[in-house]
A protein has these predicted regions:
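Short, aromatic/His-centered strand-loop micro-motif at the edge of beta-sheets
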Residues: 281-301
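Short loop/turn segments immediately following beta-strands, especially the blade-tip
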Residues: 1-4, 56-64, 113-121, 179-184
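Beta-propeller fold recognition
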Residues: 153-210
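Secretory/extracellular carbohydrate-interaction modules
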Residues: 219-278
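Structural motif
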Residues: 48-55, 106-112, 158-163, 170-173
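Ligand-recognition surfaces built from glycine- and aromatic
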Residues: 325-353
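Surface loop/turn signatures of beta-propeller and other carbohydrate-active proteins
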Residues: 1-30, 63-87, 121-139, 192-195
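Short tryptophan-centered beta-strand motifs in secreted/extracellular beta-sheet-rich domains
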Residues: 89, 240-242, 298-315
Length: 353
């Protein structure tokens, strides 16, 4: 693995009917069903310029001979994807999964499809997202018993909360969970959670009149006026853990970060009416979102793992939303309810030893 020799004669170009300029992101694996090596390549139809994942096979990759097969997946009229980038394919239990990233539709991020066979047909789950818009180019790997997905959290240009999403950033890792119906969920890897073993106190900075605090439990009565409790900075690396309940179908509740003396903040909130977890910047523009169906008066577990400006929120070990929040580590954070009554209980803060 240290010394490589470039084979100058090796070249694969797009077959007839496909766009040669965007013909990239090869993913090679040994296909147990075919007893051959398979290679996925991201490209587009030509004409038409619609996203497609081509499939090539080879009995001997070193020979440079790859035979084109029927496409693994072509974007549907409902998808209408321009490009499906950084594709990955794997089997988990009885299902095959196809993962790809898409950055041009109104639902940007890392998506997946599932099937009973590598040849399909591929079905789209009700929620086909692995994470929101700030987790991209997800690729997977297994340690033999668990499977993880690795993606990057985009930086912004300029590098502040109002900057535009740029390319590349910090790596974030989720553990993939297979639900009983075959759909996928995400949770924080146990090895990551174990790093945060030093307990610290959540120091209250300020509370609005409609917040009740009692030994790590907080009731936010924000139906009429915004309810907000803020805490002092928890530093560069920390994990926030709590249980929360939403009292009604309308309104939002969640967390605020990078609160400053002017009263501005970024927020990640739970929106039952929209069926989403949503990240907003400091001028209340939506920047990322993840579908999640909430129910009133139901308790949910939430974990937030932060390092620098990266903030990753997990709910019930089932869903994740990754965010970029500049200035978080130097500033206050808190809990918020707007048009909503909510409770946060057993609030715990831990840091690495």
């Amino acid at each position: 693995m240290k010394n490589w020799t470039k084979v100058l004669s090796f070249k694969i170009t797009a077959p007839a009917g496909y766009y040669n300029y965007d013909f990239r992101d090869p993913h090679v694996f040994y296909n147990e069903e075919l007893k051959k090596y398979s290679m996925l390549v991201s490209t587009q139809t030509e004409p038409g310029r619609k996203a497609v994942l081509l499939h090539f096979t080879s009995t001997d990759p070193a020979s440079g001979k790859w035979d084109v097969q029927a496409p693994i997946y072509t974007t549907t009229p409902q998808d209408n994807y321009l490009m499906m980038e950084c594709a990955d394919i794997f089997k988990m239990g009885n299902y095959w999964y196809l993962i790809f990233s898409e950055n041009w539709s109104g639902n940007k991020g890392t998506h997946y499809r599932m099937a009973n066979s590598i040849s399909g047909p591929w079905t789209t789950p009700e929620n086909d997202m692995i994470d929101g818009e700030y987790f991209y180019a997800g690729k997977t790997a297994s340690d033999g018993s668990k499977r993880y997905v690795f993606g990057w959290t985009a930086r912004k240009t300029p590098e502040n909360d109002l900057g535009n999403k740029d390319w590349a950033g910090n790596m974030v890792i989720h553990e993939l969970i297979q639900n009983s119906d075959g759909t996928l969920g995400t949770q924080a890897p146990q090895k990551v959670k174990d790093l945060f073993s030093k307990k610290i106190v959540a120091e209250v900075d300020a509370t609005s009149e409609n917040v009740t605090a009692n030994n790590g439990n907080y009731t936010l009565s924000g139906t009429t006026n915004k309810a907000l409790v803020t805490f002092k900075s928890i530093g560069k690396k920390a994990k926030i853990k709590a249980e929360f309940t939403l009292g009604k179908e309308n309104g939002t509740s969640g967390f605020v970060f990078h609160t400053d003396s002017n009263g501005s903040y970024c927020k990640i909130v739970f929106d039952m009416a929209k069926g989403k977890i949503i990240g907003y910047n400091s001028i209340s523009q939506e920047v990322t979102r993840m579908p999640f169906q909430f129910q009133a008066n139901t308790k949910y577990d939430v974990e937030i793992i932060t390092e620098g400006s990266v903030v990753v929120l997990y709910i019930n070990g089932k869903a994740a939303l990754t965010n970029r929040v500049y200035g978080r580590e130097q500033n206050k954070w808190g809990l918020i309810a707007e048009g909503q009554n909510s409770t946060f209980s057993n609030l715990q803060i831990t840091q690495p030893e």
